[in-house]
Structures are given as structure tokens and as C-alpha cells.
């Protein structure tokens, strides 16, 4: 970037004499303030005032003439609370941070206060571009693990990192399963003793030493999403909702066994390459299995075209919930005061009506928590706050995770 004051006869580089950045309004921009510059404008009424755009937002200065004195130009971020993002994953712990997010381009954040910028900035060591998976050990809440793709050039950095203080500080794993391992999904045993990572288009890999070594999980197909039981650290689960197959492990993820399910998903969509597109957005929360916080082997399958629940201890006997017709996103939240079962949140069609819904009685009844004016476009995920009943977070395409307080609904 150059500046001229004589009609283009001579030019002075703006950044060669030094510069200062004020990141205070958006600390996450510190990782890469200058990139994707598309435009610069000088205030026609004030030659000291200029602005330029980047992929992380707009920057502004009021001392542009410092270049002439060979002094630093000070730039301040303009994007206070406004940013185009794609949230890819949400994790709400029972203690500590209210929410830990995985986001496209910016990596992700540990949110202690959703009303203010995260003072820690985006997750570091390493910085991810995309964080496709983030979760934690339910019985060891300080342990959180994330997987994604690296941001920029970070020699020797790994695409998996973990925190042992609830997302404040991060440690890179020593190794990855293969040279190309990145993105995908991560599952962490309830006590944190074992992790299962399924990188993009890859087999599932198990580590029991925080990524120092890896082994292939036996009995799983490639590219399938695995979750951990929230109580028993030996149990992991995965589901292929369209093929009606449940995979389960009782040895900490080393071996999985397949069980045939009797679901009622639309058979016309099976075996068709285009079916995945018609079954909602692949980045969304449908056609997944979920484990209920605080309850062993209490499982939900949020299929695109139906909701199924199993609490049978001896076998996996899923029953369909007859009111739910379509699901785009599904999640849990803190139980209503006086209840012992977590609140359930769902985005989809119930009783013929599209909306955002909450159930306080294990999906026997539902309350709509939005209205026709507040639909928000494409919503990929929904996640209840596990520390405050009635607060819920939704992932909107091209926005940050959006909190909504709906306890009075």
C-alpha cells in the first residue's frame, strides 16, 4: 500500500515506516490482520482518515500523514461484533466456558461471555483455519479436543490439539494418524482416557496417550462420525441412519460391533448418490447419533426424516417419536428446574410445522421457541447451554454462534 501527495509523481510505502494495530474490538484478528485486501478509501474531507478491507474485517486510521514523518501509522479494527463466519461445531460444557465453538476460517473460540469478544482470541497452538470438530470429556470437563485444518504456514504444526484447562490454553498432539489427517470428527471418552478421530475421508483412529500414538479402530467404515457415551468411558457409538446400522464399542473404541436397526427412514433415498443432498445440508446435525448427558446408553438418532430414542440396557431398541417429521439440527441443554432429564432442542418439522423446538420431557411434548419472523435462514446446529436452562445457541450459515434466551417460552 502506497500514498502520494503530489498527484502520483512520487509514492511512499505506508507500512515500511512501521505501523501499529489496535485489535481490542476483535482480538481474534491479531493472527492475520493483513490479507485479502480488496479496497482502500480516503476520506475526501479528512486526508488523515483512511480505511481498507481485509478478510478479517475493515481497518481504519486517523493519522495517515505519519508516513510523511516516517512514523508508524496506527490502524484500528472497525468490525466490533460483526463478522461473516460459518460455525461448524458447538460444544457446551457443564462448567467453565459457556460455549466452545469450531468455526470456518477463524478456527474457533472459547466463549466465557457471549456478549463480548473473546479476550483470548481465536484458539492457538496451533491456529486453525477451519475447526470441524470440537468436544470434551464429559466427566473430566477441563479436557477439550479440537481437529481442523491449519491456518497459513505453521511448520511442524499438527491438525489436532487439546486443552486441559477448559479451552484457555492448547497443546498440540505429538503426532497425527497419517500425513494427510485433518478435519473430520473427534470423540472423547467420558473420562478422557481415549479419543477417536475420523479425519476427512479416512478410517477411524484411536489414541490412548493424547496423540502420541494411534491405532485403527476395528469394525468401522470410513468417514463415519463417532460419539462417546457421556457416562461409561468404555462405550462409543456411530450410526449409518440410511443403511440402518449402529456401530458400538465396549472396549474404549478399539473394536466396534454392528447391529441392524429397524428405522423408518425413506427408502426411496437409499443408494442414490444425490440422497445426501436431499437429506439436508451435510454440515448440519441430521442423520447423527447423540448420547444423553448424565445417562449411560441413552441414545438418540436424529435422522433427517424422524427422531428415534433407545434406553434399553441390553440391546439397542430404538423407538420412533411420532410427532417429528424432519430434523435439521438436534442438541441438549440444561434441564428445566425440577427435572432430571436434559432439555432437548430441535430444528425441524413437528406436527407439520417448521420451527425451533424445545422438549422438557424427553420428547413427549414440544414447545416452539421461535416464530415465523425469526427463522434465520440456513441453520446447521443447535446446542443448549448446559449451565443455564433456556439459553440455546444456533449455528447460522455466515454468522457467528447466536445465543437466544427462551426460558420463558
Feature names for model-found ranges:
Residues 58-59, 107, 150-154, 243-245, ...:
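Short glycine/acidic-enriched loop and turn motifs that connect beta-strands
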Residues 398-405:
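Conserved small/polar residues in nucleotide/adenosyl-binding loops
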Amino acid at each position: 500500500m502506497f500514498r502520494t501527495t503530489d498527484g502520483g509523481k512520487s509514492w511512499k510505502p505506508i507500512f515500511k515506516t512501521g505501523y501499529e494495530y489496535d485489535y481490542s474490538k476483535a482480538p481474534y484478528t491479531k493472527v492475520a490482520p493483513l490479507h485479502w485486501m480488496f479496497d482502500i478509501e480516503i476520506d475526501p474531507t479528512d486526508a488523515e482518515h483512511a480505511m481498507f478491507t481485509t478478510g478479517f474485517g475493515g481497518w481504519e486510521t486517523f493519522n495517515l500523514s505519519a508516513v510523511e514523518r516516517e512514523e508508524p501509522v496506527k490502524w484500528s479494527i472497525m468490525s466490533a461484533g460483526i463478522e461473516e463466519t460459518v460455525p461448524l461445531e458447538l460444544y457446551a460444557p457443564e462448567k467453565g466456558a459457556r460455549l466452545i465453538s469450531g468455526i470456518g476460517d477463524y478456527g474457533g473460540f472459547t466463549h466465557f461471555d457471549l456478549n463480548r469478544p473473546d479476550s483470548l482470541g481465536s484458539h492457538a497452538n496451533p491456529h486453525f483455519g477451519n475447526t470441524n470438530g470440537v468436544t470434551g470429556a464429559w466427566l473430566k470437563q477441563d479436557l477439550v479436543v479440537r481437529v481442523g485444518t491449519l491456518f497459513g504456514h505453521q511448520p511442524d504444526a499438527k491438525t489436532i490439539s487439546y486443552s486441559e484447562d477448559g479451552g484457555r490454553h492448547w497443546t498440540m498432539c505429538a503426532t497425527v494418524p497419517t500425513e494427510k489427517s485433518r478435519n473430520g470428527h473427534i470423540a472423547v471418552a467420558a473420562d478422557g482416557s481415549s479419543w477417536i478421530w475420523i479425519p476427512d475421508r479416512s478410517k477411524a483412529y484411536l489414541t490412548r496417550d493424547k496423540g502420541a500414538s494411534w491405532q485403527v479402530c476395528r469394525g468401522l467404515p470410513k468417514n463415519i462420525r463417532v460419539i462417546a457415551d457421556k457416562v461409561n468411558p468404555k462405550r462409543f457409538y456411530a450410526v449409518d441412519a440410511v443403511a440402518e446400522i449402529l456401530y458400538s464399542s465396549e472396549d474404549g473404541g478399539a473394536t466396534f460391533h454392528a447391529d441392524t436397526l429397524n428405522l423408518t427412514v425413506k427408502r426411496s433415498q437409499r443408494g442414490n448418490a444425490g440422497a445426501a443432498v436431499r437429506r439436508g445440508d451435510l454440515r448440519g446435525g441430521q442423520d447423527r447419533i447423540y448420547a444423553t448427558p448424565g445417562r449411560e446408553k441413552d441414545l438418540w438418532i436424529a435422522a433427517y426424516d424422524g427422531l428415534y430414542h433407545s434406553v434399553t440396557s441390553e440391546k439397542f431398541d430404538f423407538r420412533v417419536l411420532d410427532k417429528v417429521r424432519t430434523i435439521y439440527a438436534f442438541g441438549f441443554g440444561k434441564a428445566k428446574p425440577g427435572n432430571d432429564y436434559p432439555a432437548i432442542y430441535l430444528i425441524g418439522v413437528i406436527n407439520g410445522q417448521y420451527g425451533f423446538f424445545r422438549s422438557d420431557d424427553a420428547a413427549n411434548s414440544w414447545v416452539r421457541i421461535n416464530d415465523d419472523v425469526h427463522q434465520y435462514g440456513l441453520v446447521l446446529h443447535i446446542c443448549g447451554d448446559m449451565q443455564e436452562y433456556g439459553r440455546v445457541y444456533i449455528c447460522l450459515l455466515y454468522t457467528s454462534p447466536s445465543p437466544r434466551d427462551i426460558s420463558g417460552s
